[in-house]
């Protein structure tokens, strides 16, 4: 009799233990995972700072941020010519090594409410191309919708070389036809406006008082020049549809 009672007690204890353990196990499986209390470390993506061109002229300094991400060929060409690290040929065909192309060149064409144009070693806008022509680089999200755009002049698609222009106002009619490779700051736009309102020869829009580029310094990793404003209040009705081409016009 005692053996039977002992056996019954043991079985009861085993059943109770199984029931309790089963509840605990079932509960732990159904419970949601506890959120981690470890602090999340933010991931920082490195963004390379854009180079800046500081253009010293006889009437003041211009500062323009370059866009190598939008126009890598154009920016590399401009930097190479500005610093003399790229070979080029002068108007008589002599190859230049280690000589900055833009030093002592003039802004040969300036038009009020439009732009100033330079970068031709011949100083006329129709000199021979100092470097081989290269293709346009046009980004759909980079437009002539603000003043101060720095872009290449051309004689049609894919004829960029050394000549460039800086806009005084928004020039939406140029969208899609020219390589924008930089943005100049507000002080530069003010200086551009001063230049475009100089007295010019009506035959070629060249200032009677020469505006010369003394030197261009490239500062790597500088700050970004912000657009000088929004679209112009009135269109540049006196300006031609496009900046003058280099050698083909």
How should each PLM-predicted stretch be described?
Residues 1-11:
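Bacterial N-terminal signal peptides that target proteins for export
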